[in-house]
């Protein structure tokens, strides 16, 4: 009994830290980056100032393809605003902009060899699925039936 109490006391005593954790000042942590430190408000061209009209046939097609229900007014407004935003970003001029591979472009990226370390576990993984077809998972359909 005494041995057990000594172990408990030692564990409690040994896990207490006497060092205070330092607060990090994130403004001092700087890396060479092309990401601006302050938000940039870009003026998108207002190409779709007019209201977007969606006919019922297009809405039914989107519902069937995306497996979502667009019956509510809020869902239609979200869809229209998404279409307007997509229309705005398609008009951004990116002709002379080089592709950005990483945010920290001046740091060397350490890549590892792409080797398979574990494998041959297809049967084990597929055993967790309720329905499979030709070694593929079969996901349940959404809230809209596919047959129309």
UniProtKB/Swiss-Prot annotation:
Enzyme class, first EC level, given as a word: ligase
Query: What keywords is this UniProt entry annotated with?
Result: ATP-binding, Ligase, Mitochondrion, Nucleotide-binding, Protein biosynthesis, Transit peptide
Enzyme Commission number(s) from the entry: 6.3.5.-
Q: Name one GO cellular component term.
A: glutamyl-tRNA(Gln) amidotransferase complex
Q: Which residues does the annotated transit peptide occupy?
A: 1-10
Protein's job: Allows the formation of correctly charged Gln-tRNA(Gln) through the transamidation of misacylated Glu-tRNA(Gln) in the mitochondria. The reaction takes place in the presence of glutamine and ATP through an activated gamma-phospho-Glu-tRNA(Gln).
Q: What is this protein called?
A: Glutamyl-tRNA(Gln) amidotransferase subunit C, mitochondrial
Q: Which organism is it from?
A: Drosophila ananassae (Fruit fly)
Q: What is the lineage of its organism?
A: Eukaryota, Metazoa, Ecdysozoa, Arthropoda, Hexapoda
